[in-house]
Amino acid sequence: MSKPIQMERGVKYRDADKMALIPVKSVAVEREQLLRKPEWMKIKLPADSSRIQGIKAAMRKNGLHSVCEEASCPNLAECFNHGTATFMILGAICTRRCPFCDVAHGRPLAPDTNEPEKLAQTIADMGLRYVVITSVDRDDLRDGGAQHFADCIHAIRAKSPQIRIETLVPDFRGRMDRALEILHDNPPDVFNHNLENIPRLYRQVRPGANYEWSLRLLQQFKQQHPQIPTKSGLMVGLGETNQEIIEVMRDLRAHGVTMLTLGQYLQPSRHHLPVQRYVSPEEFAEMKAEALAMGFTHAACGPFVRSSYHADLQAQGMEVK
């Protein structure tokens, strides 16, 4: 029996090193085995990158992180060029090791107590009117990081009273009641928690997570804050069927969720879970029609859609795909 790897606190484990720590193994895929990307998955980079560099500089200056960079989001150039970013709090090292995700795994450092103030000042300096705040999973913290979320929301509103805040939260595993109690007095304007995929594939896609637990988190927040929209996101291309995705959409509606994002999974490296299929824009359009028919008020469905992709437009009910 091999000895468990002793992780050094503050060290990022990525790609092969990260995947080696996952109990449910995935086999690295060679380049010639990868599915060829269809034409609709080709990304056009903006000609002017000055806005992109400006946002990165502001992040570095204040020691902040964006999930756009840490998770290698394909929309980074487009979003940064439009002056929007999704801030990732509680560090850049996740205590989980999901094999679809490019965020580093390891033993994170203690939360930066100055981060709420630095984040609020950066957002005020950027003049943002809508901001998305997410985080790594922090299973090492007794509240799962909920107090840090609440502190960030409070600090942001103190400096930018007119801003709308969307939070994309982890599942607060084993700490749901405590987390919701902490967030009660400083709730966001949109509460987002991603189911990611179907229950049949959860052990492979989200080791350490629980499908029913995530649904319950969304439901309990909605019960406590009926006036605040709840939102969830799913990826396709991991081995599920369109019908299984539609069943998950029904589960979300049954738990009070009114906003949906649905996008194509892209493999961050050959060590991550491989793409099993590419879903066509026409299929995304069909699933959007299904979502609206079952009562979602907002449904952003398309190959490049991510939870926070044009989140301000999503919240306004505008077309995003």
UniProtKB/Swiss-Prot annotation:
Cellular component terms per the entry's GO annotation: cytoplasm
Cited Pfam families: LIAS_N, Radical_SAM
Co-factor(s): [4Fe-4S] cluster
Enzyme Commission number(s) from the entry: 2.8.1.8
Catalytic activity: [[Fe-S] cluster scaffold protein carrying a second [4Fe-4S](2+) cluster] + N(6)-octanoyl-L-lysyl-[protein] + 2 oxidized [2Fe-2S]-[ferredoxin] + 2 S-adenosyl-L-methionine + 4 H(+) = [[Fe-S] cluster scaffold protein] + N(6)-[(R)-dihydrolipoyl]-L-lysyl-[protein] + 4 Fe(3+) + 2 hydrogen sulfide + 2 5'-deoxyadenosine + 2 L-methionine + 2 reduced [2Fe-2S]-[ferredoxin]
Cofactor note: Binds 2 [4Fe-4S] clusters per subunit. One cluster is coordinated with 3 cysteines and an exchangeable S-adenosyl-L-methionine.
Superkingdom of origin organism: Bacteria
Record-stated family: Belongs to the radical SAM superfamily. Lipoyl synthase family.
The protein's name in its UniProt record: Lipoyl synthase
UniProt source species: Edwardsiella ictaluri (strain 93-146)
